[in-house]
Amino acid sequence: MDKYKVVIVDDDDVALENLSFELWKDARFSLEGTARNGRKGKKLIMKVQPDLLFLDVEMPDMTGLELLQEIRDYV
């Protein structure tokens, strides 16, 4: 079985590190990349086309919900 491709977008370094570590321990997931803001996250998501997204709701440039609205027609 193929691994689930995962992308994390979060501006909190601790949350990003902890979630990345937990995903790294689980053989079902492949962490394809991380981004620290919505703008970079959008580029990464469009490139990777992940199976699973972890998005921070509150980020300085764009909320997780705004990011979802921008990518929903492309992934």
Give the ranges of each region predicted by the language model.
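Conserved acidic segment of CheY-like receiver
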Residues: 3-14, 19-23
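Conserved sequence signature across two-component system core domains
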Residues: 9-10, 35, 53
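Alpha-helical elements of the RecA-like P-loop NTPase motor core of helicases
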Residues: 17, 42-43, 69
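Short hydrophobic/Thr-rich beta-strand motif most characteristic of the beta2 strand and flanking loop
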Residues: 28-36, 44
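Acidic catalytic/metal-coordinating carboxylates
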Residues: 37-40, 63-66
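Conserved phosphotransfer cores of two-component systems
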Residues: 46-48, 70-75
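Active-site beta3 strand of CheY-like receiver
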Residues: 48-54
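Receiver (REC) domain active-site loop signature in two-component systems and cognate sites
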Residues: 57-59
